[in-house]
């Protein structure tokens, strides 16, 4: 068939809906509806011919219904159905009928019924899609993102967006019921240092000046508390120009909250109620607050990180004191020079091959390990290890006791600075859990991490940096440390971690100007710079700012965990790639020279 003939043929078979009005979605009909006249609309998922009868799986975002074209019911409609192909758009009218007993499909909610069609309207045709839209076919992510509107027709993707809608609805309802006000804050604001790079927007009316897209509504929500709004929330887009990972996007959605006249316990209580409601509405799962708490220091000691996955054990054990007097010179030297020696016990893993161990050594090197010492526990406390000969029998027994090591266990050691050892063993612990299939995606383990340091020293910048942001309140008992040992001061911050992923965090804020000025000074921000960047906030703190605090949740990351997705991109309708590109629209893209000139920008490329 020539292209022109094909186009004319397609044009003749496409029709309008006319007087047809949809009565049901494709997931709705059951045995109780047998005998009803119904009208369904959707896409052709599959077409099958059996003995002259044509079967179509008709799909919409809700589900699938089998529709049947039988020449004995309507020969004209049956003849018309011969032309149907995948992804054509249909409207059908027919009668709900029971499927023959041996033809029922228990995998579908509509699997007990089918529609005997007596009217068919072809609303649109489709070229052959670039990939099958079933669940079984593996499709490259780049191709899916290029044709995202097709990818979103796939049932799993449609379910993700439906679940996201339910989540947002549940959050709004909960916060509205708890006296929160939904208030919008500006998208075009000024650039302020919050850690990551800002996305900058040049001003056309103010030559050489730029807006920044917000990394968070932090300052505006604090100003709303000073304005007396008392309880604020917003489900808001935020932007960060940073290197991307599987759980990061340049633009992301944040559940943002702020409350006045509260302390940490009250904010945590409100938040746990919201999470409890969210999981009930989306997964019909009953959570039981209060959630567990762990301090930052304890989390680092036990799990090597500040976002502990507590679904499994394999905790870090501190062997530094044993190492200070042990025979192994490498461990002893590191321990005596202020480093640390720690280990984890992978129970019943002594069967790991040398190839496995070499692979784990290479993995540990990615996080700064100069090597990876290991021990396989044999009968009677014997060690199988390249380092076994360097330890006395008593030393081996002490280490085995500290690690609760039994025959068949596999021990891994880290010896270096605390920073390196925590990262190496923390990541190795997670890698072992993945290899041993210890991470149950259907288990939801929540823990609050508290008592973070207020700031840490950045050697590259030669100044202190906030762990969270400069507006986090220090503990009252640590105020005097701001001038003498700011890295020793603890903050009134709290993060909520789910299955080893930080899903939200917040703090009590500074509400007194003198304290805010002292924190900025400790961060190396002098009065002139503070007035330039935060003068509006400092002035507001002088005009009756109430005690306040809040937190923010990453909605995308939370939905990734709720849906069990491997990537945050699977829960966002139109995500960017890890290079911050949109394969669908081909953004970012070049713009006309005239547009740049209007913005006082000089192009540096040749046309």
Curated annotation (Swiss-Prot):
Enzyme Commission (EC) number: 6.1.1.23
Does Aminoacyl-tRNA synthetase count among this protein's keywords? yes
* Reaction catalysed by this enzyme: tRNA(Asx) + L-aspartate + ATP = L-aspartyl-tRNA(Asx) + AMP + diphosphate
Tell me which domain of life the UniProt entry assigns to the organism this sequence originates from: Bacteria
GO MF annotation terms: aspartate-tRNA ligase activity; aspartate-tRNA(Asn) ligase activity; ATP binding; nucleic acid binding
A Pfam family the protein falls into: tRNA_anti-codon
Positions of the UniProt region annotated as Aspartate: 218-221
Please cite one Gene Ontology biological process associated with this protein.
aspartyl-tRNA aminoacylation
Looking up PROSITE patterns in the UniProt record yields:
AA_TRNA_LIGASE_II
Q: Which cellular components does GO assign to this protein?
A: cytoplasm
Record InterPro entries: Aa-tRNA-synt_II, aa-tRNA-synth_II, aa-tRNA-synth_II/BPL/LPL, Asp-tRNA-ligase_1, Asp-tRNA-ligase_1_N, Asp/Asn-tRNA-synth_IIb, AspRS_core, GAD-like_sf
| Binding-site positions, ATP | 240-242, 249, 502, 554-557
Protein's UniProt keywords contain Protein biosynthesis: yes
Instruction: Give TM regions.
Output: none
**What's in the keyword line of the UniProt record?**
Aminoacyl-tRNA synthetase, ATP-binding, Cytoplasm, Ligase, Nucleotide-binding, Protein biosynthesis
Q: Where does L-aspartate bind?
A: 194, 240, 468, 509
Localization of this protein: Cytoplasm
Q: Which NCBIfam families match?
A: aspS_bact, PRK00476.1
Q: How does it assemble?
A: Homodimer.
Q: Which HAMAP family match?
A: Asp_tRNA_synth_type1 (MF_00044)
Question: What is this protein's function per UniProt?
Answer: Aspartyl-tRNA synthetase with relaxed tRNA specificity since it is able to aspartylate not only its cognate tRNA(Asp) but also tRNA(Asn). Reaction proceeds in two steps: L-aspartate is first activated by ATP to form Asp-AMP and then transferred to the acceptor end of tRNA(Asp/Asn).
Q: What family is reported?
A: Belongs to the class-II aminoacyl-tRNA synthetase family. Type 1 subfamily.
Task: Name it.
Answer: Aspartate--tRNA(Asp/Asn) ligase
Q: Which organism is it from?
A: Desulfotalea psychrophila (strain LSv54 / DSM 12343)
